[in-house]
């Protein structure tokens, strides 16, 4: 079967022939429809994030997949069902976090991540997955269901942010998303669909005309250009915000976000920064602001099957124009390299292995 | 009546004569028993925190009070009842946070704090308070009930910390308190009384023999000397911890605490740092650790009537030896200055205005 890999010797994605995997009892053989590409994939390809499976020189790419059950073996799934796989699997014996259904909360070193770190991903004609790492999707999501994974990541961050404020009567009204990549735009879209955030902002560093700015404004949000209005200036230029969602991985944002918050606000950090950057911060002022204004910061990574189910509901309820606008390219395996090209107008791309 | 004030002209506490206040309907006249002294009082006296009431050159000190209802007017209280007052009152018209019973979540500028900022405190033979800012205490707390305020501050921080982890199945086992002052020790005592924290640490910078180290060890916790084991070294020297409670206001602790956390852990910040200290941090590593390990940081200040009620229950259940060990001096008004002296062996002091 076709599979798209990166190898230790060749740091560009290549199409290779791999044997079709055989499902064992308890696992499911899935015929892949589409697999999305995101910033993490580019880091995996560049070798700055993740790693190869043990004893392997190649890694099958892809962690944002949708497919159709080809062989359910003895599981609760039926052939033909639409499914999306979660990303983490135990590295060795499952830890209690896996037993509790929350591998997303597991400690580094206790898991592999399919298509990212230590385990082959889903960019192949077929893949297998344990049934408990698969979530059924409604038929309406056949086209855009590969967005379930990134939407689930945003769902989890929003859940953690709201939970952090659940000890008191909190009535957020405004939110700011840092980043207008696909994860930032999906987070913004989820917030726009919620009742509790009337006023939305999204920060980027692009000039008009730009398709992401069009999406931001069509969602009813205000675009903020970080080149003219840095994060720390947002309260003065616009307003202090109840929630910040950091979706760029730019490390200074994690600290500036504290200043952008209204009293009792929360900053959720989704973007993963590179290691090793040391810089000055107004340390005691940030600490003071956290304490005296009851602010919170929550980090959030990955997502579990529960978040995938919530994401499927969310995705099914998002307006059609939105996914059409965010998904700027779906490329079949013959043209797979186009899915890994970052263009001025590209937002989210996917490789298509098959159609329903 | 007797009152203990600090004045713009004289930055040492003085005993003065003040007229006894008259309660208006809806408010209660309280005969003061004891008022505690904490670090905030010392900052108020030094002029580094808080401020005088509008148009006044003197501030009555004290925000940790217990007293007896002298005149309940038309309120739900009865004469003779033991009560503790909360600290914040509206500055001008009450904001929605006051209407919701959570002045502790109010924005700076919308409140005054009795004995701290813009309103006279409780260090007087009598004070008045709106009934909704008073909490009834059981008779058993007549001696140590002035600790209700600091215990309520710790209760709130613990509540916010736990809430921040409530979106998933979290099973904390270890906690680290930074600071062995009275707030740190009370926080440690509350954690020791809970079922969910088997392993406790408390960090200070004192040498044995020391009464705070004795308390820490009698509570079953391990004392960590920050001069030999800085916060960031605690995971290697002891273990990564599920919770950190920062009760010193030392700004670097707020950042080092992130490194001390186990995956999915939370750092609660209670101590209030001075403003204006800028320093270098391993910014992207901290950001990365927050995200990849799902860590949280929550700031917490003040407390509301609900936290006072929880604190009264907590305080009533603490072992007798503990409050006896923490309260190192109760001084009557004739010797009030002793309550403001910080000695090697003093932990928590109070001024006694009257006895039950």
From Swiss-Prot, chains A, B:
Keywords recorded for this protein, A-Z: Carbohydrate metabolism, Metal-binding, NAD, NADP, Nucleotide-binding, Oxidoreductase, Zinc
Residue segments, region Disordered: 1-26, 86-107
GO MF annotation: an example: D-glucose binding
Basic and acidic residues composition-biased segments: 8-21
Names of the cofactor(s): Zn(2+)
UniProt xrefs under InterPro entries: ADH-like_N (IPR013154), Glc_1-DH_arc (IPR026583), Glu_dehyd_C (IPR031640), GroES-like_sf (IPR011032), NAD(P)-bd_dom_sf (IPR036291)
GO biological process terms held by the UniProt record: non-phosphorylated glucose catabolic process
Enzymatic reactions: D-glucose + NAD(+) = D-glucono-1,5-lactone + NADH + H(+); D-glucose + NADP(+) = D-glucono-1,5-lactone + NADPH + H(+)
Residues annotated as binding substrate: 40, 113, 149, 302
Disulfide links within the chain: none
Keyword Aminoacyl-tRNA synthetase included in the entry's annotation: no
Ligand binding (NADP(+)): 180-183, 205-206, 270-272, 300-302
EC number: 1.1.1.47
Residues that, per the record, bind Zn(2+): 38, 63-64, 149
Pfam family, one: Glu_dehyd_C
Family: Belongs to the zinc-containing alcohol dehydrogenase family. Glucose 1-dehydrogenase subfamily.
Name this protein carries in UniProt: Glucose 1-dehydrogenase
Organism, as annotated: Halobacterium salinarum (strain ATCC 700922 / JCM 11081 / NRC-1) (Halobacterium halobium)
């Amino acid at each position: 079967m076709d599979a798209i890999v990166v190898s230790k010797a060749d740091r560009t994605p290549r199409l290779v022939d791999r044997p079709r995997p055989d499902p064992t009892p308890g696992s499911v053989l899935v015929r892949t429809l589409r697999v999305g590409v995101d910033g993490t994939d580019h880091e995996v390809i560049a070798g700055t994030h993740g790693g190869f499976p043990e004893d392997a020189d190649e890694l099958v790419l892809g962690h944002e997949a949708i497919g159709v059950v080809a062989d359910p073996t003895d599981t609760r799934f039926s052939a033909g069902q639409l499914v999306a796989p979660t990303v983490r699997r135990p590295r060795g014996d499952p830890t209690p976090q896996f037993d509790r259904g929350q591998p997303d909360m597991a400690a580094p070193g206790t898991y592999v991540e399919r298509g990212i770190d230590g385990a082959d991903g889903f960019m192949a004609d077929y893949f297998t997955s344990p049934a408990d790492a698969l979530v059924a999707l409604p038929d309406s999501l056949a086209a855009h269901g590969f967005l379930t994974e990134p939407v689930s990541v945003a769902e989890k961050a929003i859940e953690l942010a709201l939970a952090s404020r659940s000890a008191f009567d909190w009535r957020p009204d405004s939110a700011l998303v840092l980043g207008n990549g696909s994860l930032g735009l999906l987070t913004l879209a989820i917030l726009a669909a919620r009742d509790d955030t009337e006023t939305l902002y999204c920060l980027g560093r692009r000039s008009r005309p730009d398709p992401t700015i069009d999406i931001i404004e069509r969602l009813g949000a205000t675009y903020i250009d970080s080149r003219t209005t840095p994060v720390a200036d947002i309260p003065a230029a616009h307003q202090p915000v109840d929630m910040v969602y950091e979706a760029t991985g730019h490390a200074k944002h994690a600290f500036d976000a504290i200043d952008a918050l209204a009293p009792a606000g929360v900053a959720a950090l989704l973007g993963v920064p590179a290691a090793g950057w040391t810089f000055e911060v107004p340390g005691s002022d940030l600490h003071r602001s956290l304490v005296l204004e009851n602010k919170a910061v929550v980090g959030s990574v990955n997502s579990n099957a529960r978040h995938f189910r919530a994401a499927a509901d969310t995705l099914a309820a998002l307006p059609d124009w939105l996914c059409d606008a965010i998904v700027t390219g779906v490329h079949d395996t013959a043209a797979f390299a186009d899915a890994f090209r970052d263009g001025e107008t590209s937002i989210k791309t996917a490789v298509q292995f098959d159609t329903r």
